[in-house]
Amino acid sequence: MYDFIALGCGLIGKFLVTELSNLGYKTHVIDLKIPAELKESSLITFQEGDVFQLVDDLPKSKVILNLLPGSIGEIIRPLLICRGNDIVDLAFTESEPTMHNQLAIENNCTLLWDVGIAPGLSNMLIKKEYNRDSGIKDVTVKVGGNPAQPDDDWSYMAPFSPSDVIEEYTRPARIIVNGEVKTVDALTDLHSITVSDFGTMEAFLTDGLRSLLGSGMGSNMREYTVRWPGHIQKFIDERNSGELDERKLLEE
C-alpha cells in the first residue's frame, strides 16, 4: 500500500513524486500520461486516465497531493474535501481555498493550500519572522524561476504549468497598502532590480500573497515576479497588439 496519492505529475508533480520516492515513501500517481522514469520506480504505482473518473475509487484514509494545473485543481478540490481526504494542495487557483473551510470542517479533513515555494515557503518565512520580532511592518517578496541566461526570444521556460504562468500574468494582483487589501493590474510597478550573480533583471506585481492577505501580519505587503529584462514587455506588447497567441505559447 502507498503513503500518498498524487493527482498530476507534470513539471512540479514529477519532481515531488521523485523526491518522495527518494525519501522512501510510496506514492500512487494518477494522470493522463505517466513519465516513463516514474513507472520504473518500485516505490511508485500509477494509473493513467481521467482523474475525475478514477478519484472515487481511491481510499479515503490517504493524504492526496493536488498537483494539477489551477483550472483543473480548482474543480477537483471540493470533491476531495467531500470525500474526507486530507489534502496538500499546490494548484494555483483563482478562487480562494478558504471558501471551502466550512466544507472541510463538516467532512473532518484538512486542506493545506498554496504550499509551493512562493506562495508557500515564502509565507512560512514571513510568519516565522513575524513571530520572532513580534510583528513586521513591510513585506516584499520577489521570486522567479528563470533560465540561467537570457536569449533572443522570451528568455523563459515555464518551471510549472504553462497555463498557470499565463494566469499569473493576467490575474489582478492583490497587495496590502496601509493595512488594506488593494487590487491592481498584474504586471504593474515594473522595475529593474539587481540579482546576485545574474545582474539586472525585472520585477512586476503578481497575485502571490494569497494566505498572507488576511493574516494581519504587515501594514504593507507586495509580491513581485522576477524575469529577464524585456520578457514581460514582450508579453504586454503582443497582448496589446492582439498578436499574443496563448495556445502557441502553451505548445512551446
PLM region descriptions:
Residues L90-W113:
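Rossmann-fold NAD(P)-binding glycine/threonine-rich loop
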Residues R132-E252:
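C-terminal catalytic/substrate-binding lobe primarily of soluble NAD(P)-dependent oxidoreductases
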Residues E48-Q53:
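Conserved SAM/SAH-binding loop
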Residues N66-L79, E94-S95:
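Beta-loop-alpha module in the N-terminal Rossmann-like domain of NAD(P)-dependent dehydrogenases
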Residues F4-G8:
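Conserved N-terminal Rossmann-fold NAD(P)-binding element of oxidoreductases
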Residues I12:
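Hydrophobic/small residue at the entry helix of a nucleotide-binding pocket
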Residues K62-L67, I87-D89:
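N-terminal Rossmann-like NAD(P) cofactor-binding module of classical short-chain dehydrogenase/reductase
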